[in-house]
Amino acid sequence: MSDSEEDEEEEEASEVILSSVVQKKKKKNLRFGEEVERRDGLVLLAQSTPMVRSRSQGTTRRVTPTPLVDVEKPLPNGDLYIGSFSGGFPHGSGKYLWKDGCMYEGDWKRGKASGKGKFSWPSGATYEGEFKSGRMEGFGTFTGADGDTYRGTWVADRKHGHGQKRYANGDFYEGTWRRNLQDGRGRYVWRNGNQYTGEWRSGVISGKGLLVWPNGNRYEGLWENGIPKGNGVFTWSDGSSCVGAWNESNIMRSFFNGVEKNDLIVGNRKRSSVDSGAGSLGGEKVFPRICIWESDGEAGDITCDIIDNVEASMIYRDRISVDRDGFRQFKKNPCWFNGEAKKPGQTISKGHKKYDLMLNLQLGIRYSVGKHASIVRDLKQTDFDPKEKFWTRFPPEGTKTTPPHQSVDFRWKDYCPLVFRRLRELFQVDPAKYMLAICGNDALRELSSPGKSGSFFYLTQDDRFMIKTVKKSEVKVLLRMLPSYYKHVCQYENSLVTRFYGVHCVKPVGGQKTRFIVMGNLFCSEYRIQRRFDLKGSSHGRSTAKPEGEIDETTTLKDLDLNFSFRLQRNWYQELMKQIKRDCEFLEAERIMDYSLLVGVHFRDDNTGEKMGLSPFVLRSGRIDSYQNEKFMRGCRFLEAELQDMDRILAGRKPSIRLGANMPAKAERMARRSDFDQYSSGGASYPSHGEMYEVVLYFGVIDILQDYDITKKIEHAYKSLQADPASISAVDPKLYSKRFRDFISRIFIEEG
């Protein structure tokens, strides 16, 4: 053999291609929120090695490149690949169509989507941009099926780096992202004009930041987990401000919970548009699958667990649990109602004769709450002194301590402010919720007085608080009994007597004084109140003057109009009787009479409305009463635990059931009598049909500021000439208390 022939044989041997062993690995679906592991050999591709070492020769040889060919390759599983192929896998430009409708079209490199490309989902969602090693990585734009759009940088299928997201509801975020969450500095603009600029951590506002409302209100300071915490300043549009070191339990948390209706609620969603943590999705959602070809003999396959439209909306928008802190707390107040129910009262807008009075009241309460918020000490006996009152002047141009305003010059008086601040704390009324419900952008509603006192009633738009104008004599009674009242409500947390939150007085320059008290609204409820009764236990004049056809849900009915008795569980019935006895003894000791039990009834059976001529029963959230779909609840005893379970289903939260609020009961239809013998005999009235209704009750003792003075004594003497002395309201407090308790024990019945 010649030397040239030997050289040719060696050259041929050195050009032998040594193929790598292809080991097929099990596909690994990565769920949202898990760490993405990229390890050598996770998916081993059949590919040529550019440089190999010959074992026999010990020298490095170059591998002959595999040529590119264009193919249309149907796969056994129904998928289809069209494009360039090299070495048994996609390489170059190509299109892969999955049988479920997903499609990738773009660049491939050694079996992996790499370079520029576009991925489409059957739902209409798309990603167009850069890919690397089978993943969305680099710069790209994701458009969700619902219209959400993210444009920015990606790392391993996640938003990471700088990017901007436009939400389908009109919201917008631009800033830094980390693992699909806002993290670092960013700006979020709500569709209603609210804007936050500042720091984020793990998808939640945390750090230094500024939140600005369209009306000019603003908060600038420190945040933690979506709420103000630390040093910060809340500034109103009129220039007044509140400065302090805020924490979760004090005023600033509720500055933001209290303005959710107009300011921070995002669309009609239960969750914010703001992206959040990658919580567990219960094993139902999967991470976008990796676009990598796995060669197995003649066949090939690309794993396609790409998200569909539902998953896209979950993964790219709504992963937040509503129970976590942060902006998810800015949801609708349970007392709001957006349905078709008639809201009582007339909104006090500009031009209303009480408009200036409302502005004065709002300015005064805002000033009072802010002024006394920083005072931290125990109450002293002098704090209860009726002379403990403070006058403050509010000129339109403002002073060092009062803001400028558009109303008339007026003076403002606060009675025993530290005592009422402590009472609000006792009744768990957050200072800022209190302030913003009364002093926020929403106007108050004026109600006509259902009684003969001539008082005016004002209701906040969220229905949480009631404001009543009162006489000077009533203010004196309240201030006189304030020490005993404070002791009583401290001792009995389930007391049914009216919850007082403040006593104030407004006097315009050259005008008359208007005294008013602020109270809790008994009927602040998630449920519509279809019947309301004002019950004293007397009969003389105790019926409504309205004809039957004009009675609606806003009508306050009286004793002779009552045509129900209410059945309570044994433990609730016993607690009610005990508390009524305690409250009546307290009022009797204070020489108070002429009070009432105000009762509100929500009928849970959707058929009750047709029988009683009521409008359709709607939850105060505006939805049709979902209890109609819960047949298993009907006919049972409606134990409080069951009611709580149902409300968790309906509203996503556990309701607060206490004596006088959210109480499950049964209402038995009784015959309405024109006389009062049904109550004077000591027994219950006779049922007309024995009809039973499942209800939720709200009740409390109201009008507790009337003492048995000379006026009431004269009224008693005069009316005794016309009617049975035992049937009139104006009687001695001791007799009134006994009659009231006997009456309550007859209309409320222990469930056997």
UniProtKB/Swiss-Prot annotation:
All residue ranges annotated as the PIPK domain in the record: 349-748
Induction record: By abscisic acid (ABA), drought and salt treatment.
PTM characteristics: Phosphorylation inactivates the enzyme.
Annotated catalysed reactions: a 1,2-diacyl-sn-glycero-3-phospho-(1D-myo-inositol 4-phosphate) + ATP = a 1,2-diacyl-sn-glycero-3-phospho-(1D-myo-inositol-4,5-bisphosphate) + ADP + H(+)
CDD domains with a match to the protein in the record: PIPKc_AtPIP5K_like
Ranges for region Activation loop: 708-729
Gene Ontology molecular function terms on file: 1-phosphatidylinositol-4-phosphate 5-kinase activity; actin filament binding; actin monomer binding; ATP binding
Main function: Catalyzes the synthesis of phosphatidylinositol 4,5-bisphosphate and phosphatidylinositol 3,4-bisphosphate.
Protein name per UniProt: Phosphatidylinositol 4-phosphate 5-kinase 1
Species whose genome carries this gene: Arabidopsis thaliana (Mouse-ear cress)
Gene: PIP5K1
